[in-house]
Amino acid sequence: MVMTDPIADLLTRIRNANMVRHEKLEVPASKIKREIAEILKREGFIRDVEYVEDSKQGIIRMFLKYGQNNERVITGLKRISKPGLRVYAKSNEVPRVLNGLGIAIISTSQGVLSDKEARAKQAGGEVLAYVW
């Protein structure tokens, strides 16, 4: 079966694993999923990311992060730009998530960036998701 929205699938897998407090999850690899996983690691939402090469497309293994009392670090994920309705932001209109407590993931001409990085590089683009 062909997947119509692999980014939404990635976010749903992270959300589901997080809700049942799994330590790790594996998703089929793609370039954009790899970049999103790196942003989540860099911003402190997940502990680590590994890339496993297999005979097909490869696997991204993500290790989720939890607080001292096993509380979730990721409290919410939301897909913004969808295949049926694309959402774009200009460089001066890059959204803030929960007044800076969360991040927006934006696909720009300079690669996939967090909202903070996009503001620093003055880059706009497609708003892929919010994570808080």
Swiss-Prot record:
GO terms, biological process: translation
Pfam family, one: Ribosomal_S8
Record keywords: Ribonucleoprotein, Ribosomal protein, RNA-binding, rRNA-binding
UniProt cross-references to InterPro entries, sorted A to Z: Ribosomal_uS8, Ribosomal_uS8_CS, Ribosomal_uS8_sf
Domain of life, source organism: Bacteria
Xref: Gene3D superfamilies: 3.30.1370.30, 3.30.1490.10
GO CC list: ribonucleoprotein complex; ribosome
GO molecular function, one term: rRNA binding
Protein family membership: Belongs to the universal ribosomal protein uS8 family.
Subunit structure: Part of the 30S ribosomal subunit. Contacts proteins S5 and S12.
NCBIfam families on file: PRK00136.1
Function description: One of the primary rRNA binding proteins, it binds directly to 16S rRNA central domain where it helps coordinate assembly of the platform of the 30S subunit.
Protein name: Small ribosomal subunit protein uS8
Species the sequence originates in: Bacillus pumilus (strain SAFR-032)
